[in-house]
Amino acid sequence: MESPAPLARVVPRDQHTVSRSQISPNALRVLYRLKDAGFQGFLVGGCVRDLLLGLRPKDFDVATNALPEEVKRLFRNCRLIGRRFRLAHVFFGAEIIEVATFRAASAPALGEEPLADLDPEEGEGPEISEPEEFDADIADTEGEDSHVLDMHGRILRDNAYGTIDDDVWRRDFTANALYYNIADFSIWDYVGGLEDVLARRLRVIGDPETRFREDPVRMLRAARFAAKLDFTIDPPVEAAIHAFSGLLASAPPARLFDETLK
């Protein structure tokens, strides 16, 4: 599994078990409005995984080629959060539908402190301790430093936008990298995630060492998914966790705390 991403395997509606009747009506509203405005709209991450497992998702995340500012213009009930990782939150009473723009591939660089509010690639929503409202009027949407890693490979800043073919490589586990397409109700699978979900197997997208260096908290997340969903951790992933568990000492305490509460 190496970049660039291959064309996705498109699984038609009659070959998977996800139904619109299982999806939050508010998530459907977001998806259809994006589609009607000419944008792509996909459910992505943990919600697709859970629906395939016959579980009720705790939230629904959307990925799109619309920029955060474009999402905000489509929804009066939308707020942009995070300067270092920009997300759109669309509010429907107590329910929040999170909308993220497709991300591009990593570009190593030196930078500042690691992100505490890392991206929603994990399939469980972003790790945001104190969401920061984003002022779209003064922000640079795609500066040359829009994706920055530190000397250890940890993600520092992540606003490099791309396509769905790029976005899949930014996600953590294959089980969290399935995209439900509202246009034809198909599932797009780039990395064998559908088979892994059905087999309850946890595999990392790409090289486990690289992905754990980018975000050491992924190691805790792997253990949580294995316990919560009764998944078996792939042997190379398990070996990398044993080898690089010391990297957790460099993770922001707030993110470690948040992960232990899930």
Where are the language model's segments positioned?
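Catalytic cores of the polymerase beta-like nucleotidyltransferase superfamily
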Residues: 1-262
